[in-house]
């Protein structure tokens, strides 16, 4: 144990077909595969508990994680267009890391520019932000807060093989700053075609007000490119606060970030 501070693992999601021209089955297959990341972390956590010191825990590093679509081949530089589907998957992964922040100490998407689940794309003199960039920008509002356990109640969706169960419609992470009496909630609606009414309550700390940012598109295969760099961008959206509870409707294949003032 004295020789180990961290252990690193990789996880790629490769069952989603092509980057843009994917089917509904491809969509759900890739989204469902991303849940394996939570299984990876849970298994590592169970193993590491046998070796953790009294005040010193082995840190888990996910040093490469990404969607990897079938047309992202080495001869093409592993480039793939990143769509709203990728953003929903990225949000789910980042929520997972937040929920496991007592064990996960560092993560790194593969990669930052042009490769697989990148946040910036460059083509000659043109550069633009992918939908993934905005998910990272939203989730950073958790930084400096205390992670909170999220008790989520939502329907399960059909898997890529048409089976039901095992894929929660919502992915959620939450955090709070007790001194500032503020909270942050990130929610991804994984359903490819249906919205969902979302209600959020901070146990013992009713919400006073909230602001919301929404990353949403009409089609799950929407993406940004040089000729349309702003097709997928976040926008402010309405959120109601009633008796300390947040209420909002989340469109299909969307990611929302709620900044909350608590009583």
Each PLM stretch: what is its role?
Residues 1-35, 58, 63-67, 104-105:
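Aromatic- and acid-rich polysaccharide-binding/catalytic face
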Residues 57-172:
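Aromatic/acidic polysaccharide-binding cleft in carbohydrate-active enzymes
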Residues 166-206, 212-215, 253-259:
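Carbohydrate-binding surface patches
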Residues 245-263:
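Beta-strand-rich recognition/accessory modules
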């Amino acid at each position: 144990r004295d020789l180990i501070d961290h252990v690193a693992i990789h996880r790629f999601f490769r069952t989603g077909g092509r980057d843009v021209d994917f089917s509904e089955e491809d969509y759900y297959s890739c989204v469902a595969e991303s849940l394996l990341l939570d299984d990876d972390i849970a298994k590592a956590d169970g193993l590491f508990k046998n070796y953790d010191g009294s005040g010193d825990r082995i840190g888990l590093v996910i040093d490469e994680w990404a969607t990897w679509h079938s047309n992202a081949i080495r001869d093409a530089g592993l480039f793939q267009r990143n769509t709203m589907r990728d953003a929903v998957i990225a949000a789910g992964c980042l929520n997972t890391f937040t929920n496991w922040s007592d064990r996960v100490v560092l993560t790194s998407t593969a990669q930052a520019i042009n490769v697989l689940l990148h946040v910036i794309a460059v083509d000659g003199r043109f550069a633009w932000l992918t939908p993934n960039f905005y998910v990272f920008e939203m989730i950073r509002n958790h930084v400096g807060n205390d992670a909170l356990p999220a008790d989520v109640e939502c329907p399960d969706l059909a898997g890529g093989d048409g089976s039901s169960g095992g894929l929660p419609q919502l992915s959620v992470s939450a955090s709070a700053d007790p001194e500032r009496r503020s909270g942050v909630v990130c929610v991804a609606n994984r359903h490819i075609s249906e919205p969902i009414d979302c209600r959020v309550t901070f146990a013992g700390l009713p919400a006073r007000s909230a602001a919301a940012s929404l990353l949403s598109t009409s089609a799950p295969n929407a993406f940004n490119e040089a000729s349309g760099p702003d097709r997928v961008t976040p926008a402010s959206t309405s959120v109601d606060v009633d008796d300390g509870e947040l209420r909002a409707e989340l469109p299909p294949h969307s990611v929302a970030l709620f900044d909350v003032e608590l009583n």
